């Protein structure tokens, strides 16, 4: 955590605590996603997420690990899964360039081994985006749908190779 953010941390924990009972009543699980230091100053690593969910201390509050952010913040992608273990509810798969899995430089073998080590059998989400100057703009031109379809097919093939 890049700065003294005790007040932000407390505010976040208190807010999630206040939402946890509503989540329980509606059979919903809230997930805390560590984001890289360029996008968040509160929860950046698996260790941060573990501390956060333990402070909230509610069965409806778990963690989400995102390979894109892990690639920036985690020294050991496998260890991040071991750190959070039973708290991991969702995994976002995204390569370093947000293109199809395998087109960037993330070593997914460490991610897969970490997931298998904890017996992860929950939700996996694929996150890709078509190349272009604005990463936050979904429509990148007339070939966007075609590119995204290609990324999805390539990425699904990788996921099947790793998990099936």
Where are these regions (language model features)?
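Active-site acidic/histidine proton-transfer and metal-coordination neighborhood
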Residues: 1-62, 72-74, 146-151
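Histidine-acidic metal/acid-base catalytic patches
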Residues: 43, 47-65, 71-164
């Amino acid at each position: 955590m890049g700065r003294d953010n005790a007040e932000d941390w407390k505010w976040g924990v208190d807010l999630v605590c206040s939402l946890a009972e509503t989540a329980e009543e509606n059979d919903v699980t809230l997930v805390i996603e560590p984001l890289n230091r360029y996008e968040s100053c509160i929860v950046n690593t698996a260790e941060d997420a573990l501390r956060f969910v333990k402070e909230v201390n509610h069965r409806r509050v778990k963690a989400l690990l995102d390979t894109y952010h892990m690639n920036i913040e985690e020294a050991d992608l496998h260890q991040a899964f071991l750190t959070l273990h039973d708290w991991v509810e969702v995994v976002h798969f995204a390569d370093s360039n947000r293109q199809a899995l395998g087109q960037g430089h993330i070593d997914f073998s460490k991610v897969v081994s970490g997931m298998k080590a904890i017996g992860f059998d929950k939700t996996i989400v694929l996150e890709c985006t078509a190349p272009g100057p604005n990463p936050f703009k979904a429509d990148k031109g007339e070939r966007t749908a075609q590119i995204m379809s290609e990324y999805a097919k390539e990425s699904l093939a990788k996921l099947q190779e790793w998990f099936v």
